[in-house]
Amino acid sequence: RYVQLKAFYEEAHKKNPDFDKIHYTSADTPEECIHLLNHTFQDVQFGVETMMEPYGSWFQQQDHMPSYRYYADILRMLQWQRPGERWLLKSPAHLWALDCLTTLFPDCSIIITHRNPLECVTSYASMMESMLIGRDFDRKQFGPVVMEYLARKVESSLKQREHISPDRIIDLQFNDFIADGVGTVRRIYEHFRLPLTADIEQRFQRYADEHPMGKHGKHDYRLEEYGLTKAQILDRFAFYIERFNVPMG
């Protein structure tokens, strides 16, 4: 399986080398766990389909619990020879199903990072565009679709959080991770009362030093290219910016 995955990524890098600037992956690096949901056919990792009709509306109306039960089973299967170890999993797609996570993993801790929507919406649109090579594509029509999709995802997560104990979640600013990654990690460990040894902290620091932002190239994108204005995004995400005091500089 490793050999097959390595060959897959090598071919993908050849076909779309610019994608490394956006979301670098290889057979030897971490990847988002949400790919485990691909087999349920109810997964945001299909790409733009979750933003397009009719699949988009169908997806947003579904009960995600059956898919997450499958997701949990896959994790158990992967861990069956190493019981008791703690998973560290990551995907923004989980914002659609925080209730599923807390139900199926009753001792889970949730870390949510917050980022300037002016950057996030455009960055996401650019990433999705990179997956549409060879297809007819209108950026100016796509931008508003991406904005609405992300706004609805955030709204969905806020509704679910009303039923989740605050001590199970920590909210962090994306800018803090970039400015002081290890210091932000300390805050996470303190919030969830987890032991942070000197060895673990050194390993975090070493990783941060070896993987600075932009290591694989700068991801360039411009708001206007996607048919959006600053005012539109600020208006749509005003509830989010105010709620989490998101830095806009």
Q: Would you name each region that the model predicts?
A:
Residues 1-87:
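PAPS-dependent sulfation machinery
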Residues 42, 93-96, 116-119, 127, ...:
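Short, solvent-exposed loop/turn segments at secondary-structure junctions
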Residues 51-68, 75, 79-82, 121-171, ...:
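PAPS-dependent sulfotransferases, especially Golgi type II membrane carbohydrate sulfotransferases
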Residues 70, 93-96, 152:
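Short, conserved clusters of charged catalytic residues that mark active-site
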Residues 74, 97-100:
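Short, hydrophobic/aromatic alpha-helical segments in well-folded domains
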Residues 75, 87-88, 112-114, 233:
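Long, contiguous hydrophobic alpha-helical segments, chiefly transmembrane helices and signal peptides
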Residues 81-85, 104-108, 166:
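Short, well-ordered loop/turn elements at secondary-structure boundaries
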Residues 90, 101-126:
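Conserved phosphate-donor/acceptor-positioning beta-strand/loop module used by diverse small-molecule
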